[in-house]
């Protein structure tokens, strides 16, 4: 019997009278890597928000781990243990890798923290994926790839059964992407599910078991691996979405450089 980790059925979601998701249908199976290919950005933020937070729906049903967690007739506004990893890291830059993974997580209640003990707890996870990231390294010193891996480990340790990766391939090298894909497949074999959001159809077909094309807040087509490439028009639109992703990343880098320059200017001149 195929088990489902997520089902969004006929979901219509509004904000301020504006429909952001319209008759939205998606199903992700346990241990599946599901590819989501957005033609444009419309409705994406609403979709990601609804994954983690059971906001009031105009219509439809949301099931997580085969339990009804949200429906249009009533909503409890509770959270779901679903991790979302974006190109902009959510890790605390001024804390170490091990602190981000173990200390900054829901359910951690140990008041006296022994760094050595936490590092020993982390090591089996690093050994399993075959990646060497010094546990005591500050996140600010990590590469983008290492931050992605750290966020995946944090999600696994926290017990997330569904991990979403949004546009991560745009910002790492080809060899790093292959390593990330290997880690995703490893955890998928362990029963963890993934939604892999990418603007590249070829990448999705390489990694994912099934894929869906998202347009204007709707899923318009679902593909199996090996199915023909969709029409040219949607693919051209996906390229436009990819350019938008890259422009957002450049804007983030510019904002970071601006903040660092302001910090540098505000520092008092040291006496020689």
Spans of model-derived segments:
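H-loop/switch region of ABC-family ATPase nucleotide-binding domains
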Residues: 198-199
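The feature captures the beta-strand-to-loop junction immediately N-terminal to the Walker
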Residues: 37-40
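C-terminal boundary and immediately downstream tail of ABC-type ATPase nucleotide-binding domains
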Residues: 216, 221-259
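Q-loop/switch helix immediately C-terminal to the Walker
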Residues: 88, 93-109
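Single conserved hydrophobic/aromatic residue that forms the stacking wall/gate
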Residues: 263-272
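A short, surface-exposed alpha-helical micro-motif characterized by mixed small hydrophobic
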Residues: 204-206
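Conserved ABC transporter NBD signature motif
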Residues: 57-71, 75-78
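Conserved beta-strand
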Residues: 8-11, 19-29, 60
């Amino acid at each position: 019997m195929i088990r489902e980790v997520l089902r969004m059925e006929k979901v219509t979601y509004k904000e301020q009278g504006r429909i952001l998701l319209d008759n939205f249908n998606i199903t992700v199976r346990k241990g599946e890597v599901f590819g989501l290919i957005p033609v444009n950005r419309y409705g994406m933020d609403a979709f990601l928000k609804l994954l983690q937070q059971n906001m009031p729906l105009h219509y439809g049903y949301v099931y997580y781990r085969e339990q009804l967690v949200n429906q249009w007739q009533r909503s409890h506004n509770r959270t779901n243990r679903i991790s979302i990893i974006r190109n902009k890291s959510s890790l605390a830059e001024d804390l170490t890798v091990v602190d981000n993974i173990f200390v900054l997580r829901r359910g951690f209640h140990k008041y006296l923290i022994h760094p050595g003990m936490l590092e020993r707890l982390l090591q089996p996870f690093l050994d399993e994926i075959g990646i060497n990231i010094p546990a005591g390294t500050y996140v600010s010193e990590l590469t983008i790839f290492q931050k992605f891996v750290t966020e995946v480990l944090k999600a696994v340790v926290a017990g997330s059964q569904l991990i979403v990766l949004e546009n991560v391939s745009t910002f790492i090298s080809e060899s790093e992407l292959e390593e990330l894909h290997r880690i995703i497949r490893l955890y998928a074999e362990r029963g963890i599910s993934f939604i892999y959001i990418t603007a590249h159809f070829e990448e999705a077909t390489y990694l994912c078991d099934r894929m869906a094309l998202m347009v204007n807040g709707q899923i318009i087509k679902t593909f199996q691996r090996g199915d023909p490439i969709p029409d040219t028009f949607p693919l051209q639109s996906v390229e436009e979405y990819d350019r938008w992703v890259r422009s957002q990343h450049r804007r983030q880098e510019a904002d970071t450089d601006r903040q660092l320059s302001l910090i540098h200017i505000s520092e008092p001149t040291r006496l020689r």
